[in-house]
Amino acid sequence: MPLEIIAMEQVKMMANKLWGGRFDKAADGEMYSFLSSENVALDTALIAYDIEGSLAHVCMLAKQGIIAKKEAGEILSALAAVQKKAGEGKFSLDPALEDVHTNVEAAVTAITANGKKMHTARSRNDQVSLDTRMYMRVAINEVSAALLELQASLLELSKKDCVFPTYTHTQVAQPASLLFWCHAHHCEIERDLERLSQLYARVNECPLGSGAVAGTTWNIDRNYTAKLLGFSAPTANPMDSVGSRGELEAELLSHLYLAMAHASKIATDVILLANKRLIVLPDEYSTGSSMMPQKKNPDPFELVRGKASRMLGLYVHAAGLLKSVPSGYNLDSQESKYALLQGVKTAEQSFSILAHALPLLKFDKEEIVLELEKGYACATELADLLAKKGVPFRSAHSVAGGIVKECIAKKKFLSALSASEVSAVAGVKITDAELKEAVSVDKVARFSAAYKIPAASAHAKALEARVKALDAAHALLEKEVKALVK
Ligand code: ARG
């Protein structure tokens, strides 16, 4: 995504042809560059959607008799020519034309003068809202696919199941298993996917026909354009449609932030456990030091964590645009495009990197057992064993705490205790087998039996259905366009 400000020392313009009727002087070059140079760079991501939206709009204008079928046919074939050029990457946006909407209209009008009729009954305000919703639908689907890939990589990783530590307050807590850890993160991502699915339904309403703010008195058919573009329905209120630009973007970024926070948690666990030498980092996803030859650094994992912070910034940026603006359309909302495009790219890259790196992790089981032993990770099990023998839990907790204190002083692990020692301190009879069962850190099955990662998330099906619906709409639009282009 090209984000650089295009150098435009001075864009000297005649009073703009698009809206210049009531102006005497040309727009100031610096002002124009401020408005448009970054904007057209961002709008490049919207070209395909803008053209598709125009195809549907023109089909509707013809169907409603607002323009003649012959005129529509000419506009549609000009749009198809621009679409082809854009598909080949040969359609670049001119900042002097402000945005993608005007660039497309100008390109069409250069092919056929009927292009001047294309903008009947719409505004760039409903157009940009349409384009960004269409972009967001694809983005939500692509990010969901990346999250599903991350879930699949957790499933893959869980096949290396072994005993695994858990922590609270970054201190060793209780033993668990690698599967248990993978399952926990799988659950987090399931919620991320659910949030995205729910948002998709809100995004999937068509604002086209809302006009600048108050709709239009032309006899348009909003249901028809909504259908041609694969939306579930038209939006309900024109002022809300143009005025809520940025809201869905902020919502998406907030969901992406939560998903990035989950990715960051996974990455941080990997960093910390590699630091303790329990995890061996894959060569393919680590870097070295330019000075210290022995180093193997978890750079991509750190960068995922760093990018979670960027995502929070992008969310705050988009959310901030929503307050203090009055009803209707305001150009402040143009700023949400930057946050949206950056956020989607950042999320996709981060989830993909993690998905590829995780299955390559290796585990040092001896070190893991040592970590758990050193952390007296089975002390809760020991207290529970005493409680099961009739000692009130609070007293059992105290006895087990005393045993841990003693062990620390004697530099001894819980697994080295004898049943007679424990029985004597606790005042209840414990057998060797019972004690062993309680204080063995490596009973993997015990920690894995209850957790199963599903082979396919329910959200994979929902994603498939959404993609299918978009494909079907594409086919329908193509059919309608063909009927008019002779
Ligand atoms: N570039 C604008 C945006 O992204 C498109 C709508 C412009 N509308 C206007 N009245 N200036 O929001």
Stretches with model-predicted labels:
Residues 9-215, 220-226, 288, 417-447:
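A helix-coil-helix interface module used to build multimeric assemblies
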Residues 59, 63, 84-91, 109, ...:
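Charged/polar positions within long, soluble alpha-helices
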Residues 59-67, 180, 250-258, 381-390:
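Short, well-ordered beta-strand elements within core beta-sheets of diverse protein domains
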Residues 66-67, 231, 391, 412:
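Helix N-cap/coil-helix junction residues
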Residues 77-85, 243-246, 402-407:
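A short structural micro-motif
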Residues 133-139, 144-145, 159, 165, ...:
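Charged, flexible cofactor/metal-binding loops and thiol motifs
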